From Swiss-Prot:
Protein name (record): UPF0145 protein DET1617
Pfam families on file: YbjQ_1 (PF01906)
High-level lineage: Bacteria, Bacillati, Chloroflexota, Dehalococcoidia, Dehalococcoidales
InterPro entries xrefs: UPF0145_dom_sf (IPR035439), UPF0145_YbjQ-like (IPR002765)
Domain of life: Bacteria
Naturally occurring in which organism (per UniProt): Dehalococcoides mccartyi (strain ATCC BAA-2266 / KCTC 15142 / 195) (Dehalococcoides ethenogenes (strain 195))
Family as reported in the entry's similarity comment: Belongs to the UPF0145 family.
């Protein structure tokens, strides 16, 4: 599966647009790690626990988006974007979305 954030795929011709595809996941940190992250935020610097959590969430959202595109018969996804939002205290949703296409 080819993924790109552009409107075309270099070296390929889009022959069919299959529409919007998306994948999302909601993640929360373990309370112990959340406390550690809170303490780290007081002194400043990167909060590695949340960096790792969001990286894992983005990867899962991409996998789910790719699965939806494959179900539609796509071999590429163009205009890939990410959206992140807080859905409740200490939990975040990550969504990946784009346009499923067939390229040759």
């Amino acid at each position: 599966m080819i993924l790109t954030n552009t409107e075309d795929v270099a070296g390929h011709k889009i022959i069919k647009n299959l529409g919007l595809v998306k994948g999302n996941t909601i993640r929360a940190k373990h309370i112990g790690k959340d406390i550690l992250a809170g303490l780290r935020s007081i002194v400043g610097g990167e909060i590695e626990e949340y960096t790792q959590m969001l990286d894992e969430a983005r990867n899962e959202a991409i996998r789910r988006m790719e699965a939806e595109a494959k179900e539609k018969g796509a071999n590429a996804i163009i205009c890939v974007r990410f959206s992140t939002s807080a859905v409740m205290q200490n939990a975040s949703e990550v969504m990946a979305y784009g346009t499923a296409v067939i390229v040759e």
